């Protein structure tokens, strides 16, 4: 408990101190802030203007400091750190290109996903090298075990990449991604503790909770900084790999239900638009706008209302998971 407290407060305090200086630095470097989509909600062109991205740099710095200081660097923790940093580098390049071109598009989606899958597959193969014979097995719920066999490697890679991009899609409102990530880390860390999977993984989760809470202080509406792709892609990958390491990938889908809904809303919207355009010559939409949080914005909901209601949903689903499915 004392060690967990050290990890939490080290990451939180370190982030809380660094963020104000980092925000000032970013505003000097990029006066225009993160490029905003002109096709997005009209209010964002005003409320998101001149807000700098790349807050994920401080999130990672604040998280990794206590991990390196207080957490035992087991192969699992080292793998978590490496995968997180690789995805952070990809996100940093994406953010940099957006700022350089002053356009909301950075790396192409195909390029990002290809690199993500390569990194994830390499990470899972490394995990396989030092894992036990039960490597291909995962827990569904209440002791129900599924053996994926040879399919587990691509499945685990899909979880990591899917989680990374789901957090990225969710990061569209002030405080939305941060609150969802905090909940996911909290309950995945709790599962690791309850199941005695690995106390070091619990400490890893606690470090990120502290760092993201310090970020949330400056990211609540109206946000002073965004986490950027360097934050969302890396944090999402860390969540996905954490669920893989504790063998609770399926439960993570329930805990991170908002991530799932946000991702599905985009897939449904794009698929239906392409289908109707092909069949009728004119594309139609299921939602007013995707991801889902923009749909509710279009219906007149305020950012704070959407963020809080989505957070309530994720907490309820997480408590349900711990109570009835674990």
From Swiss-Prot:
Under the cellular component aspect of Gene Ontology, which terms does the record hold? plasma membrane
Instruction: State whether keyword Transit peptide applies.
Output: no
Q: Please list which residues make up the signal peptide.
A: none
The alphabetical list of record keywords is: Cell cycle, Cell division, Cell membrane, Cell shape, Cell wall biogenesis/degradation, Magnesium, Membrane, Metal-binding, Peptidoglycan synthesis, Transferase, Transmembrane, Transmembrane helix
Q: Which domain of life is it from?
A: Bacteria
Reactions catalysed, as given in the entry: UDP-N-acetyl-alpha-D-muramoyl-L-alanyl-gamma-D-glutamyl-meso-2,6-diaminopimeloyl-D-alanyl-D-alanine + di-trans,octa-cis-undecaprenyl phosphate = di-trans,octa-cis-undecaprenyl diphospho-N-acetyl-alpha-D-muramoyl-L-alanyl-D-glutamyl-meso-2,6-diaminopimeloyl-D-alanyl-D-alanine + UMP
Its placement in the membrane is given as: Multi-pass membrane protein
**What is the uppermost EC class here?**
transferase
Q: In which pathway does it act?
A: Cell wall biogenesis; peptidoglycan biosynthesis
InterPro entries recorded for this chain?
Glycosyl_transferase_4 (IPR000715), PNAcMuramoyl-5peptid_Trfase (IPR003524), PNAcMuramoyl-5peptid_Trfase_CS (IPR018480)
What compartments host this protein? Answer: Cell membrane
Which BP terms from GO are recorded? cell division; cell wall organization; peptidoglycan biosynthetic process; regulation of cell shape
Family named by the database record: Belongs to the glycosyltransferase 4 family. MraY subfamily.
Its protein name is Phospho-N-acetylmuramoyl-pentapeptide-transferase
